[in-house]
């Protein structure tokens, strides 16, 4: 498939989990890719993995997206390499699990810095390039943005803020011809999910298998998602066939979300 051939994409958090799956999928459809990750080792591994299934140009940049300087640095790197940008995917931002009120301010500050503030900053920096290209923004948010969980307060608060920002950004996109959508992945088999399961198992003195089974039962789902499930939707949203989908938040959660909003 080459529906995105000639396009350039930037994927934050693109070295692991859902972000890596997104970068692979976009590259397999012909896009040139820059991914940003938190370490040189992750960036090197991601570059090898993406290059193995793509003939396009693949670049990776290790950076701390929690800071304005980090966001600026990765934007400058992308601009030097590619010049323009057709697709911005913000997938960075694992928040810390825990039980309130034991979680302190640092957990909330860190969560907002990496997922929310980085999303805002990257959108601001890349916006002129995206407007020039009549491009696409896809934010990877999360179902907790709509269904608060007392045991996932940091993630829920951050996700809700990012979803609200994404909807507002879509309004600006109507004026500047930039498509903006966001995705709410459900329980997805990643290292991040394993960390959350481990944290809850520790806090509640349960086994990880028990926590996993409890979570699936509570959400009424038959299976956990795979990163490729979300990646497939991102690729579709960035293609011409999805041009009239704008300002939408779409769940990829196996039916876990019970409401229809």
Annotate each PLM feature.
Residues 207, 219-230:
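A conserved structural motif in NAD(P)-dependent oxidoreductases
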Residues 128, 171-172, 243:
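Alpha-helical segment proximal to the catalytic Tyr-Lys
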Residues 8, 15-16, 39:
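Conserved glycine-rich cofactor-binding loop
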Residues 71, 99-100, 104-112, 215:
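Substrate-binding pocket helix/loop in short-chain dehydrogenase/reductase
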Residues 136-162, 166-175, 187-188, 217:
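Catalytic loop of short-chain dehydrogenase/reductase
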Residues 174, 179, 245-247:
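Short, small/polar-rich loop/turn modules that mediate ligand/substrate recognition or access, typified
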């Amino acid at each position: 498939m080459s529906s995105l051939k000639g396009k350039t994409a930037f994927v934050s958090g693109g070295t692991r989990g859902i972000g890596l799956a997104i970068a692979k999928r976009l590259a397999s459809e012909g896009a040139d890719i820059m991914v940003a990750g938190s370490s040189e080792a992750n960036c090197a591994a991601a570059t090898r993995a993406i290059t193995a299934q793509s003939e396009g140009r693949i670049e990776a940049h290790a950076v701390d997206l929690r800071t304005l300087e980090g966001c600026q640095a990765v934007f400058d790197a992308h601009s030097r390499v590619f010049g323009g940008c057709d697709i911005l995917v913000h997938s960075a931002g694992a928040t810390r699990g825990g039980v309130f009120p034991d979680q302190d301010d640092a957990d909330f500050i860190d969560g907002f810095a990496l997922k929310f503030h980085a999303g805002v900053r990257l959108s601001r920096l890349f916006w002129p390039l995206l407007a020039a290209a009549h491009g696409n923004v896809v934010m990877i948010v999360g179902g907790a943005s709509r269904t608060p969980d007392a045991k996932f307060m940091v993630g829920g608060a951050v996700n809700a803020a990012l979803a609200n920002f994404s909807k507002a950004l879509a309004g600006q996109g109507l004026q500047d011809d930039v498509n903006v959508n966001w995705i709410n992945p459900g329980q997805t088999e990643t290292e991040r999910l394993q960390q959350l399961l481990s944290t809850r198992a520790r806090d509640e003195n349960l086994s990880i298998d028990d926590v996993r089974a409890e979570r699936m039962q509570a959400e009424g789902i038959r299976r956990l998602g795979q990163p490729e499930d979300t990646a497939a939707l991102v690729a579709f949203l960035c293609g011409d066939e999805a041009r009239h989908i704008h300002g939408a938040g779409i769940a990829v959660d196996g039916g876990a979300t019970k409401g229809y909003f």
